[in-house]
UniProtKB/Swiss-Prot annotation:
Subcellular location: Endoplasmic reticulum membrane; Late endosome membrane; Lysosome membrane; Nucleus inner membrane
Species name: Gallus gallus
Induction: By myostatin.
InterPro entries, sorted: E3_ligase_sorting_rcpt (IPR051653), PA_dom_sf (IPR046450), PA_domain (IPR003137), Znf_RING (IPR001841), Znf_RING/FYVE/PHD (IPR013083), ZNRF4/RNF13/RNF167_PA (IPR044744)
Name of the protein in question: E3 ubiquitin-protein ligase RNF13
Secretion signal span: 1-34
Residues in RING-type zinc fingers: 240-282
A Pfam family per the record: zf-RING_2
Membrane topology: Single-pass type I membrane protein
CC annotations in GO: cytoplasm; cytosol; endoplasmic reticulum; endoplasmic reticulum membrane; late endosome membrane; lysosomal membrane; nuclear inner membrane; nucleoplasm
Main location: endoplasmic reticulum
GO BP of this protein: organelle localization; positive regulation of JNK cascade; protein autoubiquitination; ubiquitin-dependent protein catabolic process
The protein's annotated pathway: Protein modification; protein ubiquitination
Occurrences of domain PA (ranges): 64-160
Length: 381
């Protein structure tokens, strides 16, 4: 579960990084405004900035080429004159309209009804570019042609050199920048997914660490089951291995199943907040009776190996013996070993005596006269 969440988070992070880099690179390459390329009779070229309207169709990707015609009337608030007739039906005409006196959507709709393929609306007494919009849904549904907005200086230049009467033509270049909601919404979705995955990963890890720490610590009810001994002079315990202070009369000692004793104030925080093991021998400190942990959990804990696990684990039988039993068994073992050593010594002495007798006999044999040995050899043959 944790591994799969980590893989998902890694994938989401990679996607987020790639999308962010590509998005910024894409936005830096995109133009913020469309352009109008104007060609006069002598093939002279000039470029004008424009701003597309928020209604109507978008310009085709290859651009829209057409002949520029001045609107009659110029404000196009009423039906305007249609474009001139030409033999080539594929020829497009673009109308130039003046701003003010009526809404933008009315101007563009009148241009569409007159037969124009696009409309250019110019500002009055200003070169500022305005984003043309509309609040009338019924009119918006009827508008099919694209339209752009230009400044007054650009409109004057177009009228002087690039109209249809003067042999010029224009090309409306579309803008390729996407609206804000086109890339902002996917960006926010990806960021949200990454944050959700990170939160899930952190919560899962916190729960697992909390469960692992709780499993490795001793509960309060388990701690109460461990015996407490009041120290008296003459006891076999002498020094607390945690605080290194000598025991005094009346000190409360916590006796662990491994027979190690510590001050209650020293060992209790260790058992309940750190690990339920003996600080010295690392043996598990679990009450022998009434332990609520299952055998499966205890076996799993015993099989777990960590950096704190001792290289030589104490035998299970040792955990149930007291210091007196340990000393008694140790003395009994020493007596047994000493008796064995004595028997071995006696055997060694007997064997050494036998060997010495054999050696003496061989020496005696070797000291016998040569003729007797020859005689024995002859009889043997």
């Amino acid at each position: 579960m944790l591994l799969s969440i980590g893989m998902l988070m890694l994938s989401a992070t990679q996607i987020y990084t790639i999308v962010t880099v590509q998005l910024f690179a894409f936005l830096n390459l995109l133009p913020v405004e469309a352009d109008i390329l104007a060609y006069n009779f002598e093939n002279g070229t000039q470029t004008f900035d424009d701003l597309p309207a928020r209604f109507g169709y978008r310009l085709p990707a290859e651009g829209l080429k057409g002949f520029l015609i001045n609107s009659k009337p110029e404000n196009a608030c009423e039906p305007i004159a249609p474009p001139p007739l030409r033999d080539n039906s594929s020829t497009a005409f673009i109308v130039l309209i003046r701003r003010l006196e009526c809404n933008f959507d009315i101007k563009v709709l009148n241009a569409q009804r007159a037969g124009y393929k696009a409309a250019i609306v110019h500002n009055v007494d200003s070169d500022d570019l305005i984003s043309m919009g509309s609040n009338d849904i019924e009119i918006l549904k009827k508008i099919d042609i694209p339209s752009v907005f230009i400044g007054e200086a650009s409109a004057n230049s177009l009228k002087e050199e690039f109209t249809y009467e003067k042999g010029g033509h224009v090309v409306l270049i579309p803008e390729f920048s996407l609206p804000l909601e086109y890339y902002l919404i996917p960006f926010l979705i990806i960021v949200g997914i990454c944050l959700i995955l990170i939160v899930i990963f952190m919560i899962t890890k916190f729960v697992q660490d909390r469960h692992r720490a709780r499993r490795n610590r001793l509960r309060k009810d388990q701690l109460k089951k461990l015996p407490v001994h009041k120290f008296k002079k003459g006891d076999e315990y002498d020094v607390c291995a945690i605080c290194l202070d000598e025991y005094e009369d009346g000190d409360k000692l916590r006796i662990l199943p491994c027979s190690h004793a510590y001050h209650c104030k020293c060992v209790d925080p260790w058992l309940t907040k750190t690990k339920k093991t003996c600080p010295v021998c690392k043996q598990k400190v679990v009450p022998s009776q009434g332990d609520s942990d299952s055998e499966t959990d205890s076996s799993q804990e015993e099989n777990e190996v960590s950096e704190n696990t001792p290289l030589l684990r104490p035998l299970a039988s040792v955990s149930t013996q007291s210091f007196g039993a340990l000393s008694e068994s140790h003395s009994h073992q020493n007596m047994t070993e000493s008796s064995e050593y004595e028997e071995d010594d006696n055997d060694n002495i007997d064997s050494s005596d036998a060997e010495s007798g054999v050696n003496e006999e061989s020496v005696v044999v070797q000291l016998q006269p040569n003729d007797e040995r020859d005689y024995r050899v002859t009889n043997t043959v």
